[in-house]
Amino acid sequence: GAFFPAGARRVADGVDTDTASDWAIASFALGPANTPTSGDAPPPPPPTPATIMEIQGNGQISPLAGERVETTGVVTLFTANGASLWLQDPDGDGDPDTSDGIFVSGGGFPMTGTRPEVGDRIRIVGTAEEQQFGQALPLTRLRTVEEIEVLSTGNPPPDAAPLEDLPDIAIPDGIAFWEPLEGMLAAVSEARVVAPTNAFGEFVVLSEADAVPGSGYFPQTKQVLVGDLGAGAVDYNPERIMIDDTSLASPIVVMPGDKVLSLTGAVDFTFGNYKLQPAPGSELETHAPPTPPASTRSGPNGDTAITTFNVENLFDLVDDPVKDDAGSTPTPAELETKLTKLAAAIEVELRLPEVVVVQEIENTAILQQLGDRVNAAAGTGYVATSFETSDVRGIEPGFLWDADRVDLADAFQLAGPEVEAAFGPSSPSPGREPLVGVFDVEGHEVTIMANHFKSKSEDDPLFGVNQPPTRITEVQRKLQAQVVRDFVDEVLAADPQAEVMVAGDLNDFPYGEPGEGADHPLAILEGGPGQPPLTNLIDLEKDAERFTFVFDGNSQVLDHMLVSPALLGLVRAADVLHFNASFPAVLADDAATPFRSADHDPLEGRFTFG
């Protein structure tokens, strides 16, 4: 007959009849409710209880990295999107080598528990982790938050560490200063803005104690310059205090000359820099930008001006399928603003030089569009030329010259095996082959080389694990400098009185950095024993004005103009025209001003040929 597995259960109706009806055959249907399992998985081991200071440890790496931890602290600040926060132990451990604060990262908070607010003292369970990118220093943080419990509310913030009189020479000393403050509240007062708000919402200040002459800070320009200390040593100004906007709904827009009267924030580390993420309530003293022109000049004018100008990504409207230019292709409105600003810059700030040595254009046609804008406004006769390069984005150096005042006799691009090895597709980073223009200026034959060397963007950050930082791009710039110097030597060997200029964005300082010695790119260009010297006209500029670019708050020279002995005799003066690098990046979208038409300041040389 039919098979019934053994098993019965008593009917739970509360009535006992002492018959078979008091029982029911048990169900053995193998549905989810009746399927045997191995049982629940064992719970994970409990998290390791630890104070924030124990999680941070007294070095760069947390001794608890990779472990689930449980800690407590007071919430001091949230990121603007509310997804992450900073937490600080209000009492600390009294050890100056351990941080009392920590960043809690991540994509929201657990479904169980209460969402905290600033001032809440919380218990939190998460995983200790070191966030690190490339050769930058690591950031100790908590991630994968499992639990948050609010223990109390309305707690006052911990006292903020004052940021004043920071280490001002050696980067390792700066790292040693900042690391024990990671994640903690810190404060600046009466600080001087030395770099404008950039496109990432960051700006840089110096404490009042550090903003003194002789430290790299120049009160004339209110900026801090990278400095040559001699023997390959460089002052990279570790006393810089960067302020970011990750905790703000919108960035704080400032420029050199402004002051931060008071600002408190959490110490963070991102993109190779220690920085403050501001809490609400900052007090600022700001001023409006000047009325154009902002450029100033010293010395006589001469009869001819030659200016080198990196115009920063002047691209046309076409996304070229064979170039990596999708991220650089503007909208029609963006291109209109760019051309309007650059045309105003050439007319108002550059004062219509005879020759502009240009970098970062996509092609001759877009450069000619710029020339046509200037011609329509000023009645000049600017003509453009450039040659396609090996650069993956397709940017080129070029010339824009006023054909009503000078003539271009010849233009060509350097070529050959050495050029290929330094600039071409087989080079470490395909780049921009030099462009040579031979100009007739007042009856003088002037040979100008337009250059755009490999950038420093792939080098180690200053605040990195390698000290001194490794500069891997330096090798290629040396190759590029040697190619250019070899061409100059050929010209001067044929005619020692030739008037030769090497100009452009050379992406390097006019002095050696740690480990370079005397064999740095600018020294190669200037020439060694037995070579005719080239003189860098940046040396004629006043110390306070000697910068063409601002990076991470450090004002520095990247753009150069070197001249042969015969051409040096015709020089009257040289000036950097400061109307871009010192101004906030937001002005790049303002067509009503030439300020921030690009990110580099032009370098102008003035000559007397007549």
Where are these regions (language model features)?
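Extended non-catalytic accessory segments flanking core domains
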Residues: 17-21, 25-341, 376-377, 385, ...
